[in-house]
């Protein structure tokens, strides 16, 4: 419905590269072009972002570091059940490609 409306969105920011690729397919199916009509940005930084056409701009997150850190925090909590909760922040990177 949004793609057929008189006032369409300028851009889509998807919660994953997979959903962004689906949005690009829906945009093309509606006879519109990415990024000329609607820009698209994904999130994850997966290999899929380089395989779609046009290549997908994405927010790359350090997935392996997130996994390692989560396991370390879990093991620490198992060994020290009374340990306070920890908040961990990790860097991300915007990868500019042709979709936005």
Where are these regions (language model features)?
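Flexible loop/turn connectors
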Residues: 4-100
């Amino acid at each position: 419905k949004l793609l057929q409306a008189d006032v369409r969105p300028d851009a889509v920011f998807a919660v994953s590269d997979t959903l962004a690729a689906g949005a690009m397919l829906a945009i093309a199916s509606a006879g519109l072009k990415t990024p000329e009509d609607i820009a698209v940005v994904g999130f994850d930084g997966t290999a899929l972002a380089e395989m779609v056409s046009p290549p997908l701009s994405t927010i790359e997150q350090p997935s392996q570091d997130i996994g390692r850190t989560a396991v370390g925090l879990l093991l620490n909590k198992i060994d020290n059940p009374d340990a306070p909760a920890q908040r961990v922040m990790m860097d991300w990177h915007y990868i500019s490609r042709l979709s936005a």
